[in-house]
UniProtKB/Swiss-Prot annotation:
The gene is ecpR. GO terms for biological process: regulation of DNA-templated transcription. This is HTH-type transcriptional regulator EcpR. It comes from the Bacteria. Part of the ecpRABCDE operon, which encodes the E.coli common pilus (ECP). ECP is found in both commensal and pathogenic strains and plays a dual role in early-stage biofilm development and host cell recognition. Positively regulates the expression of the ecp operon by binding to two TTCCT boxes. One of its GO terms (cellular component) is cytoplasm. SMART domains: HTH_LUXR. It is found in: Cytoplasm. InterPro entries: Sig_transdc_resp-reg_C-effctor, Tscrpt_reg_LuxR_C, WH-like_DNA-bd_sf. GO terms for molecular function: DNA binding. Residues 162-181 bind DNA. PROSITE patterns: HTH_LUXR_2. Belongs to the EcpR/MatA family. The lineage of its organism: Bacteria, Pseudomonadati, Pseudomonadota, Gammaproteobacteria, Enterobacterales. Induction: Negatively regulated by H-NS. Positively autoregulated. Also positively regulated by IHF.
Length: 196
């Protein structure tokens, strides 16, 4: 990858983060037109099921699309995007392959709830349930990534090899592979496919 491509990607990520902080951008990523339009219409559609006004939702909430296209960005910059949404009610919309990561962020940060897009029979009710503040730890439907697995996922996303990860984590290469396999089972995919 060239320097210019790296620069463009960094600019794009910063631009996404800026959009996320603006009060009129309550759905991330605003550049994913189908998701943005679909979720906007869905929120208006469930107006009668939610207790808060649409204006309050636009002002206080951030809805984040955790799909396979954006996972690397969220993994590599989780401290950045979590600080960027501080003070907001964050709702993660998780695709099947990102459910375990969504659960990790729910347990380890101030996330209001997770909507499991792949499991939901009625996404309207699931979304209203989370917006209304009823999502609790008992509602977690899948495994979550452990702290050690998350560290290994982050380092893998940065392009590090298992031997280097083992050195940094002060463990054997076999242990790194075991954690990777466990994470891959929870994510329904090989790590290298998710973080490319």
């Amino acid at each position: 990858m060239t320097w210019q491509n790296d620069y463009s990607r960094d600019y794009e990520v910063e631009n996404h983060m800026e959009c996320q902080n603006r009060s009129d951008k309550y759905i991330w990523s605003p550049h994913d037109a189908y998701f943005y339009k679909g979720l906007s219409e869905l929120i208006v559609d469930i107006d009668r099921l939610i207790y808060l006004s649409l204006e309050k939702i636009r002002k206080d909430f951030v809805f984040i699309n955790l799909n396979t296209d954006s996972l690397t960005e969220f993994i590599n910059r989780d401290n950045e995007w979590l600080s960027a949404v501080k003070g907001k009610q964050v709702v993660l919309i998780a695709a099947r392959k990102s459910e375990a990561l969504a659960n990790y962020w729910y347990y380890n940060s101030n996330i209001r709830g997770v909507v499991y897009a792949g499991l939901s029979r009625d996404i309207r009710k699931e979304l209203a349930y989370v917006i209304n503040g009823r999502f609790l730890r008992k509602d977690i439907k899948k495994d979550k990534i452990t702290d050690r697995e998350m560290e290994i996922i982050r380092m893998t996303a940065q392009g590090m090899l298992p031997k280097s990860i083992a050195r940094i984590e002060n463990c054997s290469v076999k242990t790194v592979y075991t954690h990777r396999r466990n994470a891959e089972a929870k994510l329904y995919s090989k790590l290298y496919k998710l973080v490319q």
